[in-house]
Amino acid sequence: DYRTAPAKVEEMGGYSVLNHVGDWVNSNRYPERSHWDVFITYFANIFKDYHTCLGMEIKNNTDNVTRADRALWDELLQVVIPKGRNIWAFADDDSEKLNEVGRSFELFVLPENNENAVKKAMKDGNFFAASRYHKTTDGIGEFEGDGNVPLVTDIRVNKKENTITVAADPDRDCEVIEWIADGKVIATGNTIDLNDYEDELGCYIRFQMKGSGGVTYSQPFELRYSGRVDKPVPDWALWIFRTEPGQKFMKFYHSRTFALGALVAEKIRIFIEDKIKK
């Protein structure tokens, strides 16, 4: 249950973040679940109802359980931003041992280093998520960096020209800057001219920087323009969380019996597909 904690934290006047949701969704094993309406609806309504829930982890520890969480984040951005708020990206060690410190972390942009400045930056999204580790759902392009992740030294938004330009710290390796809209990489490079990608844009754009040290993620830039077509929250799936039959289904869904059945079904599917290919 991811809803109870944000509700109580907001009631008490605090801020919350949803951690490693892929653990609960089990999307690290079944990445397609990051695109299921039932989970998009569930988490979207948490962010809609509790604005003190600032965002979600897109990286946790070595990224094993969160490898599919960027996909869910992108799905949520498409339906939550049109409702009047953003979802900030977080990355955390989840460290239980000293040697786990420094695996995934945030880089805050602060006028001074104190508690109030950190809280304000968290609330406003003035920080980057970063990690030494990059895992993918298909295993392609995975790597472990040395921790010296790419750093952003400047971001310039030209509203007249519709461009965004990012400057990277020359002392940190940055092999590529990828620009992502609706979950897809649509451009690479330090500058994106949004006019060149009008047919591929939705309500946001974000970038990620990859280098030998790891990956650094920006927060989403909301795009406001005439003719923007927004995706609705797939509220048809709310019955699962608001009715007794739905609650029984979710209890069964998170049971070992269901997990075992899903695993067997997946093995059968792979076996059949391999036979067809041969």
PLM features: residue spans?
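Domain-core and long-helix interface of multi-subunit machines
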Residues: D1-R103, R172-I186, E198, C203
